From Swiss-Prot:
Function: Polymerizes as an extended structure around the baseplate-tail tube complex. During ejection, the sheath shifts to a contracted form, thereby making the inner tail tube protrude through the host cell envelope.
GO cellular component, one term: host cell cytoplasm
Originating gene: 124
Protein name in the entry: Tail sheath protein
Heme as UniProt keyword: no
Compartments in which it is found: Virion; Host cytoplasm
Annotated source species: Mycobacterium phage Bxz1
Keywords: Host cytoplasm, Viral contractile tail ejection system, Viral genome ejection through host cell envelope, Viral penetration into host cytoplasm, Viral tail protein, Viral tail sheath protein, Virion, Virus entry into host cell
Single GO BP term: symbiont genome ejection through host cell envelope, contractile tail mechanism
Amino acid sequence: MAIDFSQYQTPGVYTEAVGAPQLGIRSSVPTAVAIFGTAVGYQTYRESIRINPDTGETITTQILALVGEPTGGSFKLSLAGEPTGNIPFNATQGQVQSALRALPNVEDDEVTVLGDPGGPWTVTFTKAVAALTKDVTGLTGGDNPDLNIASEQTGVPAMNRALAKKGIKTDTIRVVNPNSGQVYVLGTDYVVTRVNAGEDGEANTRDDLYTIQRVVDGGHIDPGDIVQLSYRYTDPNYHEVIRFTDPDDIQDFYGPAFDEAGNVQSEITLCAQLAITNGASTILACAVDPEGDTVTMGDYQNALNKFRDEDEIAIIVAGTGAQPIQALVQQHVSAQSNNKYERRAILGMDGSVTPVPSATRIANAQSIKDQRVALISPSSFVYYAPELNREVVLGGQFMAAAVAGKSVSAIAAMPLTRKVIRGFSGPAEVQRDGEKSRESSEGLMVIEKTPRNLVHVRHGVTTDPTSLHTREWNIIGQQDVMVYRIRDYLDADGLIGMPIYDTTIVQVKASAEAALVWLVDNNIIRGYRNLKARQIERQPDVIEVRYEWRPAYPLNYIVVRYSIAPETGDITSTIEGTTSF
């Protein structure tokens, strides 16, 4: 698609491969592997909070009732270790009240008593106090006389500080006493309260903030106590594009790759681990965000769309091996590459349960037929999972992640052919040599196990085997690096926005040549020729740079030709057991 400068274009440096899409300036060469797929969906967090003093007036009510029908004597009450004097078994409410008000830890206006002589007595404290204790050794008569005490508190518990994380799954909150290990009970000891609805003002979304409040009546958490909480939460940015350089950070964020049964629960974690194992230094990840329990292709597409205009991406990898994702990724790669964000994709088919037949794999490659997209074959591979301490069968999408890591770890001119892929024991499907050759010729990047037990790429091809230039993975890679570098050089020289003088064309040509020389010196391309720069007469604000470039072609074949030399002279023996002629 030719650049149409008769239509308005944003001022900048534009590049155009003859017969290919228009490409615009962005930034330096991208090297990140972008992965989208499923994740655990939450993170786990632990924190401690101190329970604030209750707010408002707290009322403590205690009911005292004599049992066993005592006929004489007295009893004592104690509050926080401070005992009263003797209280007659048939005391009036005034006698009980006077005894309690005489305690050093109670003010006169903090306690009142109601009841008949001999009880029961209702004791009301206007503050939070512990239950009264008793001494009934002074009671006489009756049948084992005793004093029953029932206590309850009513009041308003304070609002504690908000918990540290947003998007808490409230049903996963666990509250314990850090000293005794006692697990507090929801509803009995505490309640969960929403502090606010977050920036969106909508309740029950991922930016909500929560806290806990103690239950005053009957609960086991007191003001001033320090309690420890653990919970699961989904950060509001959990399903956005996030940059990683450390595999441990990826696992901490998206969860372990496998569940206890050995099923893949975090496609992102496993893909990222394999990409980094094979040389990737930067991962851009985006977790799918399903609305229900089942992940749909629309969920994958939503995650893929979030990679738009991300300038670090070199290769896209899908965490799913479902066939419908292939067309979605191809459309994404094509649209972004036509809009100054050049990128490629390596995909795989999921044959972990039922292998995808070779004919189907070939048909999938033919339906894609894009020099920017590679499709891995076969569809299943054996992988040793150290966390499970056993081998599992994975789909081809995980091999695609490993190959993507290998690709970005080398210079653009380096072919993928015969490159060793680490992390796998080998294909889980048996293929004959003829079948593998046919697949390679039809646009499948075949992974095989060599007689030396190495797992490598048989031939680094794209899904477009039309010609050498569209077939070889490293040629389109060289082109991407080349246009990025030329745009960088031209833009860095500050030419855009300057007036065009007689020397401007020379400056533009010199800047482009400096970029091309750098590419040659760094073994990105082999060479270039016929570099020209001209001002277009019909569009005088456009300077066009043209040249031809030569890629570093992959060495795919070595031909050794030989023939039998006829005997032309006498045969003589030179060393015992050998002859010469």
